[in-house]
């Protein structure tokens, strides 16, 4: 009996391998979607660190929103995946040469930005308000500058 308890404690502290694999797969799917060349070439999303972050925030928030309808297991997978996503952001900043002292501040800023974006997207989708979603995408993904075309509208239509 004690052996089972110890395993349960370690599983709760460190998570299971299956949980990690599921989160890895979901993050890979979100990342693949956010990196599709069509967003940058055809929809005018800036192919920059900020543009890539914004598409990760958009597609991550859509995936996590869908998982929110799946009860506790969905919430756990969403949190595990979000944790991995921010760990990947941390790694990316380090690979770009951001010093150890600057990483926590930048990741905290990214976290706040993600929360704001996810809340704006979720509110618009819950309300069924395509115009509000398009406005949030224009404000966040395109930094308020309309691309030459209908990229924000097309992204909003997909997200609805």
Task: Report the location of each language-model feature.
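Surface/interface-facing alpha-helical segments and adjacent flexible terminal/loop regions used
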Residues: 1-160
